[in-house]
A protein has these predicted regions:
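Short loop/turn segments at strand-loop or loop-helix junctions that form parts
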Residues: 4-10, 40-44, 200-208, 244-245, ...
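Extended catalytic core of nucleotide-activated donor transferases of GT-like folds
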Residues: 5-165, 270-275, 279, 295-297
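Catalytic binding pocket for nucleotide-activated donors in carbohydrate/polymer assembly enzymes
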Residues: 13-19, 24-25, 31-45, 219-222, ...
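Structural alpha-beta junctions
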Residues: 28-36, 61-72, 149-153, 175, ...
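A structural signal for isolated positions on well-ordered beta-strands in alpha/beta enzyme cores
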Residues: 38, 128, 153, 199, ...
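Short loop/helix-cap segments at secondary-structure boundaries that form the rim of catalytic
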Residues: 118-124, 148, 164-169, 252-258, ...
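P-loop/Walker A phosphate-binding loop and immediately adjacent motor/lid segment at beta-alpha junctions
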Residues: 121-128, 135, 170-188, 312-314
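Conserved catalytic-core segment of nucleotide-activated headgroup transferases in glycan assembly
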Residues: 165-282, 293
Length: 380
């Protein structure tokens, strides 16, 4: 049986090592389970063919770096379209004939974030929808077709989806839950870093849209971090850093610097999956604020980045989305609701790093391990 990993967001963003790392955890987990897996990556063409070729080259280079050469088929779609016709795509890494032969036999598609669309979608035998962002997916499923009529199973990392306190838009689909994947064979625990650096990696500005109480609020990191920007003054013995896409001439940089935050370019420190892992390992812990709607709606969402930090033996300080109840009591997390709790959490990590680091790694192995979660999703 062939397991296809359907993805449409790794190749097109070649500066995003963290972005690429998401499907990478899935693929490495499938390999650990000794399954016949193929990474199926969709790359829509742009007007810049030279840039497209650079994206293709980078995608191939990253797969080779992780021992996955020959285990992928990149579907280059020219022109780009919201519908996916295999006849209109060029297959790279695997011939179209070989792909069709695989599709003719028993197969499963793990469709990450609805990356693969109809009519190509109908060629897979068993189609599993894997939701990585419940607040957006559940909201937009109430507005448009997002694969809800064309998949056999639906899985979400919204761990709290079935509880009464979860305020995600109602869905008639039978959702099952899984944890964000971290390949704990790739992500090994690292020694204590020299610096007490609390950091995170992400996008300071956000272009998405989710309606909350009739409005479309700004859910960017810029807004979500605002209540916590006084932390460097409260805990001067710690260093606070943000690997965020803030341009050098953006006034936000100067404002954050005045408040004690060091801003670094994520394209410099986390451009590849390897450098992304190295940057996380350089941290004492992760500190981050998350999309407010996940907190307000109590979705139970946790980030794949947090899972990776844990696997590396790095504690995580973040806001609670209702996910805490689905974790072991000792888990390496410190969940917070305001700056006072954040200050206490940072001081806890500074005082008890060794113990929290052990708890973080143990939780990653027990809960977030890629092979463990894939075994559950695929019912192995």
């Amino acid at each position: 049986m062939t397991i296809f990993l359907g993805c449409g967001f790794a190749a097109k963003y070649r500066e995003g090592g963290g972005n690429f790392s998401v499907p990478l955890q899935w693929m490495l987990g499938l390999r650990r389970l000794k399954l016949d897996a193929v990474w199926l990556e969709l790359l829509p063409a742009t007007d810049d063919l030279q840039a497209d070729q650079a994206r293709i080259n980078n995608f191939q280079r990253q797969l080779r770096a992780h021992g996955l050469a020959g285990r992928y088929c990149l579907l280059y779609q020219k022109p780009a379209a919201s519908t996916h016709e295999l006849d209109a795509m060029r297959c790279i890494g695997m011939s179209k004939r070989t792909l069709l032969d695989r599709l003719a036999g028993p197969n499963v598609l793990l469709n990450l974030s609805y990356s693969i669309h109809a009519p190509f979608l109908s060629q897979f035998e068993r189609r599993i929808f894997c939701d990585l962002d419940p607040s957006e997916i559940f909201y937009w499923m109430t507005k448009m077709e997002l694969g809800q009529s064309s998949h056999d199973e639906f899985w979400t990392i919204g761990l709290n989806v079935h509880r009464n306190d979860c305020r995600l838009p109602k869905s008639s689909l039978r959702w099952k839950t899984f944890y964000p994947l971290a390949d704990t064979r790739l992500l090994q625990p690292q020694s204590r870093p020299k610096l007490s650096k609390f950091t995170t990696i992400g996008q300071w500005y956000w272009g998405g849209a989710v309606e909350v109480a009739g409005e479309f609020p700004d859910l960017s990191k810029r807004v979500m971090f605002e209540p916590y920007l006084g932390l460097p003054a409260r805990v001067p013995e710690a260093q606070f850093e943000l690997a965020m896409n803030i341009s050098p001439d953006d006034p936000e940089r100067a404002r954050l610097r005045q408040l004690g935050w060091h801003v670094i370019d994520p394209h410099r420190v986390a451009r590849t999956p390897r450098s992304y892992r190295r940057y996380m390992a350089s941290a004492f812990a992760e500190f981050t604020a998350i999309k407010g709607v996940d907190v307000a709606w109590q979705t139970g969402w946790l980030s794949d980045r947090a899972a990776a930090f844990l696997a590396l033996g790095r504690p995580v300080i973040t806001e609670d989305t209702g996910a805490a109840r689905y974790l072991p009591r000792e888990n390496g997390f410190r969940f917070i609701r305001n700056i006072d709790e954040a200050e206490m959490a940072v001081k806890d990590v500074l005082c008890d790093w060794a113990q929290l680091s052990k708890q973080a790694r143990a939780c990653a192995v027990e809960v977030f391990d890629s092979a463990r979660n894939l075994r559950k999703i695929l019912d192995l």
